[in-house]
Amino acid sequence: MTDYKATLNLPETAFPMKAGLPQREPETLKFWNDIGLYQKLRAIGGDRPKFVLHDGPPYANGSIHIGHAVNKILKDIIVRSKTLAGYDAPYVPGWDCHGLPIEHKVETTHGKNLPADKTRELCREYAAEQIEGQKADFIRLGVLGEWDNPYKTMAFANEANEIRALAEMVRQDFVFKGLKPVNWCFDCGSALAEAEVEYADKTSPTIDVGFPVADADKLAAAFGLAALDKPAQIVIWTTTPWTIPANQALNVHPEIDYALVDAGDRYLVLAEALVEPCLARYQREGKVVATAKGEALELINFRHPFYERLSPVYLADYVALDAGTGIVHSSPAYGEDDFYTCKRYGMSNDDILSPVQSNGVYVDSLPFFGGQFIWKANPNVVAKLEEVGSLLAHETINHSYMHCWRHKTPLIYRATAQWFVGMDKQPGQGASLRERALEAITQTEFIPGWGQARLHGMIAGRPDWCISRQRNWGVPIPFFLHKASGELHPRTVELMEEVAQRVEKEGIEAWFRLDAAELLGDEAAQYDKISDTLDVWFDSGTTHWHVLRGSHRIGHASGPVADLYLEGSDQHRGWFHSSLLTGCAIDNHAPYRQLLTHGFTVDESGRKMSKSLGNTVVPQTVIDTLGADILRLWVASTDYSGEIAVSQQILQRSADAYRRIRNTTRFLLSNLNGFDPAKDLLPPEEMLALDRWAVDRALLLQREIEEAYREYRFWNVYSKVHNFCVQELGGFYLDIIKDRQYTTGANSVARRSCQTALFHIAEALVRWIAPILAFTAEEVWKFLPGERVESVMLATWYDGLGELPADAALNREYWEQVMAVKAAVNKELENQRAAKAVGGNLQAEVTLYAEDALQASLARLGNELRFVLITSTATLAPLASAPADAVDSEVAGLKLKVVKSAHAKCGRCWHHREDVGQHAAHPELCGRCIENIEGSGEVRHYA
């Protein structure tokens, strides 16, 4: 038998079938670095419209986790897709460097008794080390950015510009000093921002405490009685016995009905609606003697249970009937509502009792409990109340309670002198900050849309922003306060600029080393230089000021506005929130146009990642085993708007999908062997109908893919590309063209038409996958024929795809019909193969019994119908002539019959044809193959 292999155009490419991503990806990283890819993109971006994705800075502490990987990959997909869409899309990664976790790490390693300047020095060194480790991991993910010059909140220039941002807010009168209860962590020794508070279950004691009446006559009159004939107590219920020593008032609701209850040895004042459950809790009998509205009790004095002072009744709308007694005990130093109510009744800051120190220990001078830690003092307070006859009930409750997000320990509200950004404080001109921020939210696009209501609710209900902290490692609040008046120096804004200039040269240490006389001269003796530092959320919240308009100047020409902020959904209360407030305070608008939030990673059962559960996925391990492109494909394939499921099984499914895309790409490349687009590319009018359809289908798909990228629907991009590879290419087009590609003349129109289509599709496909499969796309790019720029990222979306003319005889609808018919034939061929009636498809002959219109439609392909169906023979017949053994199909008006061919198999094309053996020189070949190797070659028109 003659070997005709040399007469075939067999596929050939050096593009490897096995990806070997863990080994090959570092080579691509080196290539990007060697050619200066990021710098080249900036160089060509000058005339392009700008798109700015501003990086929310991860904290410079610890290794990256799977959540970091999701976040950075999403950002990179956007930056790359915008670049391919013709934008100048710089990406400057950043790090959040100040704050307690780093300070805590340094103290753990070096001890807590370090001098403050040494602590700052070691914190700076530690943060720098952490940044280098995280940076290497982010680069390994394939994230394209300005890695040689990232922004760091601890960079001197950024520290200086943060001070300038604060100065601008001071100038606009948003900043004030106040005594207010703030979230306080004993372990941090500092106030916490709202974003640093999380809630967890806590078991707490609950106590019902009676406060003896001091104004008995007024209490009797309030209830319409002439006098009281026995002692009376107003009863409060609380879960914080430790606050009783700081009690200064009692709160009732003005509209609630209160009852005077005869409980035997005393009268009890309780909310009427709660009398029954309260008496049951006290294991007492009692009856209601009289009732009165809460407003009647206003300013009646009761006595503190164990201290010689009075607790007056104040009216407060926040009192509710959902638990307790309907009366709330008020410790203004340890409760926000309590604080504001007492202030409303004229209590001065000096009158507010604050016996709890920053470490959670009562001051030594507090009678009965001095020197005790408050949580440990709870039972002692309860015992004292029982001793004095004021304890009516003592139980425990499990409830949701605020905890420090770092230490996981319970917090308290604690009134301290702090610096605040006022939410409702009217600036010199214009709306309040709350009004500005709420208006800015309406001007911002949220993805997904529910984020708008969430952020709106947080801004609408939030208190003033406490921006001061009592720590060493942070950007200073460079204020001088007058020793006598406590007021800011009248030249504060000017002095802050002088400090900023020093910090720009020496870092924050310049402030802490500063002798006040250097700036104030003879005035220095009259002023205190404060040591407070800024909340780290102010650090990251002002990056739009000190990065976009400062250290990197990548904002739009109109100002430091980013097109997009993209972070996890927790950042509605974090970076999105603080950035909105600073942006609206400084520039009167949000620093972003779009906010995109993604969910958190969970395992395939929806459980949170936890080392104890053993369900964590380490990105570095995935990269080392499967490759970064698999991780990127998993991220892209997931709808990030909700929880993002990940596991080894899920990643393996992504690896399987990757292989399908890679194999399809390899098929395209292998069949472009010997193709030079400069001389072999055919114009559309010379291409076969099926090839024109394939290019048109790619064009329509590219439009959908571009739209999906614009709308950040990357899972749609993934599904469209994957389906195109599996169905339209793998399941239809690529199978059909194999015969023509392999058996027709190497330079025939039939083959060059096919290669032209494959070239166009490959040029488009490599760009479609480039934002997601960054490494693989770069690898593919090197194997594509023709002159091209050195990286796919230096290109833009492919513009060589041609559209089918509207009047094309074989239009889109026609090929949809053909695909349906082919699917029906394939189904019957599978049945026949399963029954062992035929072997391969080319051993089959198919007769299609079709109704007239369908028969006429398919007849337009003539003899080439068999090439579309990939059978040795395809015959059309009227539906009415279908024999009894013809099978129905899912195509209306079509029945099928498949039989095994009786003809010999061609040794070259493998078709079973009646003319095999009729040529003496080539007895193993069909006439078509003989024409292709010795004659002028067969002519194809359609497929």
From Swiss-Prot:
Cell compartments where the protein resides: Cytoplasm
Binding residues for ATP: K611
GO cellular component, one term: cytosol
E.C. no: 6.1.1.5
'HIGH' region, short sequence motif: residues: 58-68
Organism domain of life: Bacteria
InterPro entries from the UniProt entry: aa-tRNA-synth_I_CS, aa-tRNA-synth_Ia, Anticodon_Ile_BEm, Ile-tRNA-ligase, Ile-tRNA-ligase_type1, Ile-tRNA_ligase, M/V/L/I-tRNA-synth_anticd-bd, Rossmann-like_a/b/a_fold
Keyword Protein biosynthesis tagged: yes
Catalytic activity: tRNA(Ile) + L-isoleucine + ATP = L-isoleucyl-tRNA(Ile) + AMP + diphosphate
Function as written in the Swiss-Prot or TrEMBL entry: Catalyzes the attachment of isoleucine to tRNA(Ile). As IleRS can inadvertently accommodate and process structurally similar amino acids such as valine, to avoid such errors it has two additional distinct tRNA(Ile)-dependent editing activities. One activity is designated as 'pretransfer' editing and involves the hydrolysis of activated Val-AMP. The other activity is designated 'posttransfer' editing and involves deacylation of mischarged Val-tRNA(Ile).
Written domain comment of the UniProt record: IleRS has two distinct active sites: one for aminoacylation and one for editing. The misactivated valine is translocated from the active site to the editing site, which sterically excludes the correctly activated isoleucine. The single editing site contains two valyl binding pockets, one specific for each substrate (Val-AMP or Val-tRNA(Ile)).
Protein's name in the database: Isoleucine--tRNA ligase
